[in-house]
Design a protein with these regions (language model features):
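Acidic/His-rich, divalent-metal-binding segments that scaffold phosphate/diphosphate chemistry
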Residues: 2-120, 139
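Structural motif
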Residues: 75, 135-136, 166
Length: 166
């Protein structure tokens, strides 16, 4: 009886090692890893909360809404929640250029042309991918970062520019 208990304990430890090896070898991502990544005390999310508190709150709200939507349509809610938490980490490179992080009525976009301003805003996606690489985030999470504004060209038309860039 105790022998089975011991064997099962050893097999359980090997299962965790096997999960890790499968993830690294074949690019799988387990719910165990997703739960670890979605811990708001993880290094990247803690840094996001300190550098971009508005973006962090936005990401938390998006994660909650997206996870609920995923549950209702039968998608992988833990993956969606984790991806949503990380989708805007690129904003840490230029936090003051995003309205959710601005305070004191200072808007750095006022000193830039529309094109320069748009480039700063759009670059948060590539900046996010660089941070994701630096922190070894899984490809599934990187996919949320790279596609959260869609796959088409972002265009702000002349008449609506004042609405987006004040």
């Amino acid at each position: 009886m105790f022998l089975y208990f011991g064997i099962n304990g050893v097999l359980l430890l090997f299962a965790y090692l096997l999960i890790y090896l499968l993830e690294k070898t074949f690019g799988f991502i387990s719910n165990v890893t997703l739960v670890e990544l979605s811990d708001i005390n993880s290094p990247v999310l803690r840094q996001l909360s300190e550098i971009c508190p508005g973006t962090f709150q936005h990401s938390m709200q998006v994660a909650n809404l997206a996870a609920e939507a995923a549950i209702r349509v039968g998608a992988k809610s833990q993956l969606v929640r984790t991806g949503a938490l990380y989708h805007d980490i690129g904003k840490m490179e230029n936090p003051a250029f995003f309205t959710e992080n601005q305070s004191g009525g200072v808007n750095p976009h006022k000193n830039l042309s529309y094109e320069q301003s748009a480039q700063v805003v759009i670059s948060h996606v590539t900046d996010g991918l660089k941070l994701a690489d630096k922190h070894n985030l899984p490809k599934a999470v990187k996919d949320f970062i790279s596609t959260h504004h869609g796959l088409s060209l972002i265009h702000i038309s002349e008449p609506t520019r004042p609405l987006y860039i004040s």
